[in-house]
């Protein structure tokens, strides 16, 4: 089959070579963006007097027809035409005749594909920002229900100090807020137009790059034509931001998996987000949480792959850069799917309040309260730490907890201990006293919730 660029060649490639080099199996994802960019380009060609108005109207009418078919999923693509750009150009020529071949005036596939990807990511990143905000709303709603639910806080996966469960949930809220900020910031760089940069050096036609940028809703243009067609930073930044977001979801998934186990029993994941075993009738597996955790590695891989592709490419465009798309598409699908699943999982999970609170009474996570108690009475903290460490050892040897020790044992360790030590040891008291800014005290958690609510209710 004759290539649209085949004039310089004496023979055509073998079919299997065409298949190896073709990107249409995956870049057809850009079909709507490609047509939208072409409509703006055609409009500009007319306004600048580069093409006659009657040609422009025919071209635009044909493109709008193709766009409608694309939205209905009625376009059929061919590997023979390599990529989305040549497929659309061939369809346009078939639709309106040879005048369709004038569309590519003053344009290269290099600036065309870059424009497509900017348009694509602008749309997808905006969707991801909204999905993050929806998940944040779910976290706030769940946190509001559990301000005074006490749960062990962990370091090294060992019980450390009792905390408000809402405080734990809000830790993820703020991680997600940073993610949302990063994606919002990235839109400044995504929303620049490379259209009109040509292959790399611009064009001799009197085009208006600012006009096409305006028509496509871009904030401005790339200032250097070589940079415009060479840049894939905006995709790498998207993949990097996505990797951090997925890392945060993965960490939370790890906790959900642990908490839903019989060893913890802190939560129960809703049946809609779990599966069973083909051999063990009793099993309820947290598969969706495990899948999100696993898919995080997939997103990391997409980031590393594109960094590796780009590290050795000289300016300007190289065919290597065709490898920028599959990882981008895959990451968009993975991130959007993970956010939707995760929000549903958190919204429907059952929190076993009694189990959580019972756990805080069967450990030594209140030991810091004893050290603080002595420090407040003038004992140097390191000395207080030593005293409490010995009391913990006594408990371990006796098989009891700190609240079980009689007052005379405390007084033997330090005469500064009084009867009020037992109130300080209560998990509820221990949590509520930690009212430093950003702490787990109930008043601080309620303040944090108010801030979080304002954030999620701001567009």
Swiss-Prot record:
Pathway: Amino-acid biosynthesis; L-arginine biosynthesis; L-arginine from L-ornithine and carbamoyl phosphate: step 3/3. CDD domains: Argininosuccinate_lyase. One of its GO terms (molecular function) is argininosuccinate lyase activity. NCBIfam families: argH. This is Argininosuccinate lyase. It comes from the Bacteria. One of its GO terms (cellular component) is cytosol. Keywords: Amino-acid biosynthesis, Arginine biosynthesis, Cytoplasm, Lyase. Its main location: cytoplasm. The keyword Cytoplasm applies. It comes from Geobacillus sp. (strain WCH70). It catalyses: 2-(N(omega)-L-arginino)succinate = fumarate + L-arginine. Pfam families: ASL_C2, Lyase_1. Belongs to the lyase 1 family. Argininosuccinate lyase subfamily. Transmembrane segments: none annotated. Its EC number is 4.3.2.1. It is found in: Cytoplasm. The gene is argH. GO terms for biological process: arginine biosynthetic process via ornithine; L-arginine biosynthetic process.
């Amino acid at each position: 089959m004759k290539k649209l660029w085949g004039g310089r060649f004496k023979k055509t490639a073998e079919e299997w070579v065409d298949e190896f080099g073709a990107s249409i199996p995956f870049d057809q994802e850009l079909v709507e963006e490609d047509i939208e960019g072409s409509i703006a380009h055609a409009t500009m060609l007319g306004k600048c007097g580069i093409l006659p108005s009657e040609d422009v109207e025919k071209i635009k009418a044909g493109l709008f027809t193709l766009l409608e078919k694309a939205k209905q999923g009625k376009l059929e693509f061919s590997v023979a035409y390599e990529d989305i750009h040549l497929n659309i150009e061939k369809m346009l020529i078939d639709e309106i005749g040879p005048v369709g071949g004038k569309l590519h005036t003053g344009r290269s596939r290099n600036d065309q594909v870059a424009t497509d990807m900017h348009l694509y990511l602008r749309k997808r990143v905006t969707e991801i920002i909204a999905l993050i905000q929806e998940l944040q709303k779910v976290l706030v709603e769940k946190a509001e229900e559990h301000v005074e639910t006490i749960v062990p806080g962990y370091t090294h996966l060992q019980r450390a100090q009792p905390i408000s469960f809402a405080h734990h949930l809000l830790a993820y809220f703020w991680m997600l807020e940073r993610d949302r900020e990063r994606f919002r910031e990235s839109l400044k760089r995504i929303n620049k137009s490379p259209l009109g940069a040509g292959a790399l050096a611009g064009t001799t036609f009197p085009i208006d790059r600012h006009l096409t940028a305006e028509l496509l809703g871009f904030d401005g243009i790339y200032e250097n034509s070589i940079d415009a067609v060479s840049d894939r930073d905006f995709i790498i930044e998207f993949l990097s931001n996505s990797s951090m977001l997925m890392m945060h979801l993965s960490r939370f998934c790890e906790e959900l998996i642990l908490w839903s186990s019989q060893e913890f029993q802190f939560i129960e994941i809703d049946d809609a987000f779990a599966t069973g075993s083909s051999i063990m009738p009793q099993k309820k597996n947290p598969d969706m949480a495990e899948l999100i955790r696993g898919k995080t590695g997939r997103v990391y891989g997409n980031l590393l792959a594109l960094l590796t592709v780009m590290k050795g490419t000289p300016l300007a465009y190289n065919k290597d850069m065709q490898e920028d798309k599959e990882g981008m598409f895959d990451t968009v699908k993975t991130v959007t799917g993970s956010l939707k699943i995760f929000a549903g999982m958190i919204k429907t999970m059952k929190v076993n309040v009694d189990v959580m609170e019972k756990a805080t009474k069967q450990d030594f996570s209140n030991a810091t309260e004893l050290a603080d108690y002595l420090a407040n009475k003038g004992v140097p903290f390191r000395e207080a730490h030593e005293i409490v460490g010995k009391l913990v050892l006594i408990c371990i040897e006796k098989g009891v907890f700190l609240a079980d020790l009689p007052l005379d044992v405390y007084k033997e360790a330090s005469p500064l201990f009084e009867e009020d030590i037992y109130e300080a040891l209560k998990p509820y008291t221990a949590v509520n006293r930690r009212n430093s800014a950003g702490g787990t005290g109930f008043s601080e958690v309620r303040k944090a919730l108010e801030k979080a609510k304002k954030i999620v209710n701001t567009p």
